[in-house]
Amino acid sequence: MFPDIEVNDKGHLLIGGADAVELADEYGTPLYVIDEMRIRENYRRLYRAFSGEYSRFQVFYACKANTNLAVMRILEEEGSGIDAVSPGEIYTALMAGFDPDRILYTGNNVRDDELQFALDSGVRINVDSRSQLLRLSEIAPEGLRISFRVNPLVGAGHHEHCITGGEMSKFGVMEREAPEVYRMAMDLGFEPVGIHAHIGSGILDPEPFMLAVETLMDIAGRVHEATGVEFEFIDFGGGLGIPYTPEEEPLDIDEFASKITGLFKDKLSEYGLGRPMMCLEPGRYIVGDASYLLTRVNTIKESYRKFAGVDAGFNTLLRPAMYGSYHHILVAERPLDEPSEKMDVAGNVCESGDLFARDRQLPEINEGDVLAIMNAGAYSFSMSSQYNSRPRPAEVLVREGKVDVVRERETFSDLLRGQNVPARLLKR
């Protein structure tokens, strides 16, 4: 999964057949560059692996990873569904052309108007709590088909903030209460048809995922035995990781799929659950390594340490500051150069934690160089902000050298959009 480095006859980095240096020159920096074919290849690799083992398989892309409309259109063309966690994501998915039945809404701490929006949109609703179920029952039509998110008491992820299962998690119905909650839903006039869990993000070790699958299947079995619910789908969530460092090994997706589907089929047989749809909700696995963030070096500073200062900050790419995440960095003009000195790569936000790399061995870097920050496709633009009153960057989509602007660069006027000064504060 760690992308191979391609160069052109100038020695410049190629992304989707386009010269990264020329992209930076033409479209400005910072700039997100999205490789269309990498997204398609990642989706197809995963879909082939699982559907080859179990034909009733469906992907619901976790669009919180990257909600760019063009990215979502690509995945709609590929046959994916959408895992949406907010009304805004539902709206975006609908605008991207997804059929409502291919959108699974899994919100938490949801307002009544958000539930109404989901109902009006016709999407599938995945209920997170008793409270949500009771409030939904007051506005939902008789016989509404729903599913439940269950906390299987298994959690895993690349950082504690990304663990979404276990006793400390805010998400889902407690596993021991699952049969009771399904019965409650039936008594309220709902038709429960699915069960769901999601344990965390950035998982490269299959063992926690295997445990989560086993646990959720056991819960599904207990619910079926206690209530007679016939599951139309069982959704194991997402969390499949990608290597962020050159040393990390990617998931062997074929082996992973074989293990997961084998366990799934064994449990179906054990509990007499028939042949429901098996669902996964990958986000990072599909888009994570399909984008680069291009940023230009404007300052080389040598004080008590050496800094390469760039024109992006944690307002553009938050993960290193928030999670301490490693993102590999190339010099776009010379991507094959070997590391030669230790330095920090610092952003332009007025915070001491605004660093893309600390004490990193990097090639020679000069003012004016374009740095390419790799694996910037997931939880990157979608977590960006206007902090320090800096407009968000543009995004371009590349395929076989063709370039399309798929998000315009924000301007200063965008920083003030929606703001109003009361008349009493205006100068007379």
UniProtKB/Swiss-Prot annotation:
Its EC number is 4.1.1.20. GO terms for biological process: lysine biosynthetic process via diaminopimelate. The keyword Coiled coil does not apply. Substrate binds at R284, R319, Y323, E351, Y379. It catalyses: meso-2,6-diaminopimelate + H(+) = L-lysine + CO2. The keyword Lyase applies. It is an enzyme of class 4 (lyase). Pyridoxal 5'-phosphate binds at G239, E281, P282, G283, R284, Y379. Its cofactor is pyridoxal 5'-phosphate. Specifically catalyzes the decarboxylation of meso-diaminopimelate (meso-DAP) to L-lysine. Homodimer. This is Diaminopimelate decarboxylase.
